A protein has these predicted regions:
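Transmembrane alpha-helical segments and their short flanking loops
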Residues: 102-103, 290-398
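Signature of multi-pass transmembrane helix bundles
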Residues: 2-27, 39-48, 70-229, 388-398
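Alpha-helical membrane segments and immediately flanking helix-loop junctions
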Residues: 233-289, 317-331, 358, 362-377
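Juxtamembrane helix-boundary/capping and inter-helix hinge elements in multi-pass membrane proteins
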Residues: 27, 61-70, 99, 143-148, ...
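Small-residue-enriched core segments of transmembrane alpha-helices in multipass membrane transport
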Residues: 75-84, 158-161, 197-214, 233-241, ...
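Membrane-interface alpha-helices at helix entry/exit sites of multi-pass transporters
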Residues: 69-75, 166-170, 261-277, 303-307, ...
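Membrane-water interface of transmembrane alpha-helices in multipass transporters/channels
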Residues: 33, 69, 73, 190-198, ...
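Short amphipathic alpha-helical coupling elements at transmembrane boundaries
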Residues: 35-46, 152-167, 232-240, 256-263, ...
């Protein structure tokens, strides 16, 4: 029994179940405490995200040496191609399926969550994108100048971050996820809004699994390795993403899952997973495209033209690379495209945000799980091009 409770996937599932049940029975007075605890834990996790990014990407780049610039370019290209192809697949499914769906536009109202008892703001030392850019620039500059002092410092900083992950973030995650689902259950989002859009959500989730299968099959074919040896370890990361709705907040668990795989090079994991958590949002892109087409049909009576959707998908792939890996980050970053390319009005934008929020957790889980496939591609690329293996980073013990 003790071994079972020490298992991270079990603790995450238990947190989800307990959170949903308690959200149905807790009064407003107790929910004030839950909302406050969830807020504080979320603040702490969010604060640590830039540290995790810097602690893994920068030292990983220094260990890649002269190959750093080339690998960074390869990573960005495959992340963009994955997102755009997922968007195009979603658009094709939209043209084929949406005209035949009977979608109810009436959405039940939600209860309002009580305010937090007190606010404890823990602002990040920098934004996620700033941390990503800083990591890349410092890592590349340290490599170009052969700065041993900087490289050693980054290695020590990585060890510090690993301890923060293993001793603070991961033990706290089940409680954070339980509080999150308690809030959703109390609001009524789980019991009322989800059934209203169950058709399109199920279709989108099926699209997630189809695209993940495509990614892992392509990664396996290119690398010559068994993709199941990566995917089989991603259960905890998938569940964490469902609970946090954030690729960035799931980063700690995703790193540990990927490092358990025997077919992934550890240097590629330390370089690729934190990078892809911020630039590879294939699940969110796939979801947004299908939902935009659905809302266009509901509110405006027609689907966008093929030319419009091709432009939207191509631009959305670029916006996804720059979108923050936080809840709703993709749709928030692309609001300009939704209003400028698809010509959505305020009603369309509001409905898009509401529906997207219902399944944001599963889109995020697709993003995170897809990162493993792209890291397998990076591993294959490194081995095919004779890039030296720097497998000397220890993983946190969960």
């Amino acid at each position: 029994m003790k071994k079972l409770f020490n298992n991270l996937p079990f603790r995450l599932l238990l947190g989800i179940i307990i959170g949903v049940i308690l959200g149905q029975v807790f009064p407003e007075s107790v929910m004030k405490v839950i909302v406050t605890l969830q807020y504080i834990m979320g603040q702490l996790i969010t604060f640590c995200v830039p540290l995790i990014i810097i602690g893994f990407i920068a030292p990983s780049i220094t260990k890649l040496g002269k190959n750093a610039s080339r690998l960074l370019g390869v990573a960005i290209v495959i992340a963009y191609v994955s997102s755009v192809c997922a968007a195009l697949m979603s658009a094709g499914a939209g043209y084929a399926l949406i005209p035949h769906l009977s979608i109810d536009t009436e959405v039940a109202g939600l209860r309002t969550l009580p305010d937090v008892v007190f606010e404890l703001n823990i602002p990040q030392i920098m934004s996620v994108m700033s941390a990503l850019v800083l990591s890349v620039l410092v890592g590349l500059a340290a490599t170009w100048t052969n700065s041993k002092l900087t490289c050693d410092f980054l290695g020590e900083f990585q060890n510090i971050v690993l301890d923060i992950i293993g001793k603070i973030i991961i033990p706290m995650l089940p409680f954070y996820i339980a509080a999150t689902f308690c809030n959703l259950s109390y609001e009524g989002m789980i019991t009322h809004q989800l059934p209203a859009f169950i058709q399109i959500i199920l279709i989108v989730m099926a699209g997630h699994y189809i695209w993940l299968a495509v990614l892992y099959l392509l990664a396996g074919a290119y690398s010559g390795k068994n993709p199941w040896e990566v995917l089989r370890y991603y259960g905890p990361a998938y569940l964490t993403a469902v609970g946090t709705m954030s690729s960035a907040a799931t980063l700690a668990v995703a790193l540990d899952c990927a490092r358990k795989s025997k077919v992934l090079r550890k240097d590629m994991v330390s370089f690729g997973i934190p990078l892809f958590a911020n630039i590879h949002l294939c699940g969110s892109v796939l979801t947004e495209v299908f939902f935009c087409m659905t809302i266009s049909k509901i509110l405006y009576g027609h689907l966008p033209s093929i030319g419009t959707m091709l432009l939207f998908c191509a631009l959305l792939g670029i916006f996804a690379i720059g979108a923050p890996g936080v809840p709703g980050g993709t749709v928030m970053a692309s609001l300009g495209l939704i209003t400028g390319v698809l010509m959505f009005d305020d009603a369309g934008t509001a409905l898009m945000l509401a529906i997207f929020a219902l399944q944001d957790s599963f889109g995020t889980a697709c993003n995170v799980t897809g990162d493993g496939a792209l890291t397998l591609m990076l591993t294959g690329y490194a081995e095919k091009h004779g890039i030296k293996n720097n497998d000397n980073i220890q993983s946190p013990v969960l």
